[in-house]
Amino acid sequence: GEAVAIMSRTRYEWTGADFALWSAGAVPVPIYETSSPDQVEWILADSGAVGVIVEDAGHLAAVEASRPRLPGLREVWVIDQGDIDSLSQDGNDVDDADLDARRTALDRDSLATIIYTSGTTGRPKGVELTHGNFLTLAENAAEEISEVVKAAGASTLLFLPLAHVFARFIEVLAVTAGVRMGHSSDLKGLLDDFASFQPTFVLAVP
């Protein structure tokens, strides 16, 4: 049930970390990659995060600037420095029975994530969502648009920021419905990514 923050653009490692943390019984806390150091510090402190996964050296600097005021923050991992690969290797030493126990201890009422508001009216506020929140929404969507998500060879390209709840819904829907999912973080190159990946459908905000 410990909180671990993720601060990165939309990429495969974001989704991989999200599901890995869920499997370990942890609570992912997304942080927009554009967040200011003050916002980063507030979210890490308010959520009680014990660790944070960042994408690059710039994000690392934002975390390190406030680390002296975050006594509960024990670990910082940097995706671009290969830390996710190292974590995956370290995972080989974790007892499977321990992971199974963590997974089976979760149910639909268990806390899945804390998503922070934009903070336009003051400090960002943490919104707690359960695994049931995500699963019920994904299951209902899979039935309502089954002709799209359950079609043979269904695939989608995720380009929305994963710090936003709608993007998290899309990744859960993809896993629930067995949809192949790609990631794109470069809006300028998005059309090229569409041409390369050739998704059969896209979910996006207006």
PLM regions with names:
Residues 23-88:
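Structural core segment of the AMP-binding/adenylate-forming
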Residues 1-37, 159:
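Conserved AMP-binding/adenylate-forming
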